[in-house]
């Protein structure tokens, strides 16, 4: 979000149009001043014709022109050629002007210019209707601030001096010191310095771009509201939403409904129905179908939770994410659930708390807490703390290899679980295989159940099958042939297999 105060002062318009209002409402007669070369009065037509360096006062306004026609009874003045009207510090110029006191209308034609100490308006023609307090230009007008780059251009402009409201339509363009706003219609409320736009609107300043279908901008408080296909873009990210509220002064953004934030600098995408972002707090918060997509080299992690808090590491340009309630992770190599999570791209860690479960291929890891470590954006190790277990499904769920202990370190290789180190009260239950070969076939059969108990165990795995076990202290072991296995011996303590909880893909992560 960029800071700035881009608003239009309206002293020029108010003064100019109150000038015309005075000209139409006062009852003074025309007062001829020295300088006019020729004056003729035609009584039959009630016409005073002035020619040559015409200089007169009418209803409190000083006027210059090449020629003028004054109809006193009808309260009409026609002025032609180099028309110049002065009212205090206001100057108005045009090729011709018409004033009708009875209908309370005034119109200026040809190279119309209105200026004061601050602003100047140029247009082809200008009309003022005193009864409605409305001034109009219909064939393009340009407003510029003296001594600056501030400018607004539109095909049509309406001004309401009494209510201090102004309206521009058709090809409206506002520019000032690098900012450019283009829209179909723009209203300006002088009392609270608010611009209101309707129709497709584009706002650009330096690397910042904003788009919406309608909304408003408070130029005094530097607050804005964008609605309808709204977007906000800067050098590092793009935000899309149905509505976007932003506060440039305190650097905050609030987005609602169909929110999508794409950060190309840090390679992540956020989706939700509500987003709050604060540059000063270094925080982005999303909720309501919240989903984060983290792209790391060729690997992608999808993260869902009821609430996600994202903080920036401005030095390393990485993200730290906290997720709460109903947390789910989907990755091509692992999937997980828990109730709270802390993810640090800076430290290459994902910490899972409160009933965490991690799945990899046919393996399921559980514990009181789990820490996932990555190396070069690839999942490297998984630490499982307290009441730890690893379960590997075999033969389509008929059997399960199982490991349990106080703590477990699971090692990943090419996205697959290939080793576990169990520390403290280590237990391993597995079903070794045996090959029976005939002349034409090889049959794999389960030999039985092997159970080992030790203080520590290192178990080597291949697709969930135990291919080797190392130990420091001699374990206690027992083997049961398949036909002698008792039900109580088949399971580690607190065995539970949880396939229904496992995230299936990134598209259903936000499903409840």
Label the predicted regions:
Residues 1-31:
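Bacterial Sec-dependent N-terminal signal peptides
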Residues 23-512:
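N-terminal amphipathic/hydrophobic interface segments
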